Amino acid sequence: MADFDTYDDRAYSSFGGGRGSRGSAGGHGSRSQKELPTEPPYTAYVGNLPFNTVQGDIDAIFKDLSIRSVRLVRDKDTDKFKGFCYVEFDEVDSLKEALTYDGALLGDRSLRVDIAEGRKQDKGGFGFRKGGPDDRGMGGSRESRGGWDSRDDFNSGYRDDFLGGRGGSRPGDRRAGPPMGSRFRDGPPLRGSNMDFREPTEEERAQRPRLQLKPRTVATPLNQVANPNSAIFGGARPREEVVQKEQE
């Protein structure tokens, strides 16, 4: 079992970079501090995202950090983005820095950023399984580098109150290595009824930093599903039809 370091040795203060203060009066209420992992995967839960979020938006939010992979979580039935994602970083320092974005405003939404957690299996170790490409858009092998399983329970203290929307996905590791090792259950973390979350007041919203995302350079997302009604052969005709016309 890996050793952990706590991140309570740092003051998470707001500044113009779009970060929020952890545990402040305008935040998400009191949370028990989690431990930072000392070995991969270094994965953060990012919640309360707009429903039209795509991968490029996540890259822009954490543009100064070393991102390894991004997974936007979708509804299994509708394939719609559920409003949260998992971001794996190359090193623990980037994960630690990402936690300072908790409470930052993106539009009219207050971001939720926390350490993603998995559940240890009964036989020891963190479970994983081998398989083909993820059917939710992760790409690459589904084998876990860090041994996390998407069906494992985890506990980051958030409710699954996200519905609908459209989002993008990441094709895989941006450095041609294994994709994000963390395969978490398609649902945000849950906590007991003592969770003290409230929406910030208008006065608190006015005092919090805002993240500014530039307009997308590509009008149509790269991962948009192709039109099923489009012609398979384009402007060309099947060979049988061409031969028949020549004979006439």
From Swiss-Prot:
InterPro entries assigned to the protein according to its UniProt record, in alphabetical order: eIF4H_RRM, Nucleotide-bd_a/b_plait_sf, RBD_domain_sf, RRM_dom
Q: Spell out which residues are annotated as carrying N-acetylalanine.
A: 2
Key words of the record? Acetylation, Cytoplasm, Initiation factor, Methylation, Phosphoprotein, Protein biosynthesis, RNA-binding
| Annotated tissue distribution | Expressed at high levels in heart, liver and testis and at lower levels in brain, spleen, lung, skeletal muscle, kidney and embryonic tissues. Both isoforms are expressed at similar levels.
Residue ranges occupied by any RRM domain in the UniProt entry: 42-118
Q: Name one GO biological process term.
A: sexual reproduction
Query: Basic and acidic residues bias: where?
Result: 131-163, 196-207, 237-248
Q: Which residues form a coiled coil?
A: none
Q: Which domain of life is it from?
A: Eukaryota
State the GO CC annotations.
perinuclear region of cytoplasm
Biased composition, class Polar residues, residue ranges = 220-230
Write down the SMART domains for this protein, in alphabetical order.
RRM
Question: What are the recorded GO MF terms, alphabetically?
Answer: RNA binding; translation initiation factor activity
Where are the residues of the annotated region Disordered?
1-41, 122-248
Where does the UniProt annotation locate this protein?
A: Cytoplasm, Perinuclear region
Q: What does this protein do?
A: Stimulates the RNA helicase activity of EIF4A in the translation initiation complex. Binds weakly mRNA.
Protein known as: Eukaryotic translation initiation factor 4H
